[in-house]
């Protein structure tokens, strides 16, 4: 119970911090990934957030569970933990607990 409340508080603080940052680009690092989303850390704030794979609009990515990476269907790009990308904050909904990003490009 207490751990869940703490996580909800951290998420609320993250949303409040990003609300005035709409339209701002952030360099980000992938901290984890799965078949539906990547978890990124936004620099320099060290805020972590889940980003749906559909946000990565440069290709259609599939998760390789054995090798723990995403593979692009058209371009063959491999996405791994630690990879850097640029994301733009486009919407923050504090009440709905949601932050939406636009994918701006890969940094490495």
Regions found by a protein language model. Give the residues of each.
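Structured C-terminal cores of nucleic-acid metabolism proteins
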Residues: 1-108
């Amino acid at each position: 119970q207490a751990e869940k409340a703490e996580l909800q508080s951290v998420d609320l603080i993250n949303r409040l911090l990003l609300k005035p940052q709409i339209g701002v680009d952030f360099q980000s690092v992938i901290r984890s990934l799965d078949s539906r989303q990547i978890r990124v850390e936004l620099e320099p704030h060290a805020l972590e957030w889940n980003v749906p794979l559909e946000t990565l609009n440069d290709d259609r990515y599939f998760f390789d569970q054995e090798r723990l990476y995403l593979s692009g269907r058209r371009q063959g790009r491999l996405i791994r933990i630690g990879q850097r990308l640029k994301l733009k904050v486009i919407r923050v909904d504090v009440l709905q607990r949601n932050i939406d990003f636009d994918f701006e490009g890969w940094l490495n």
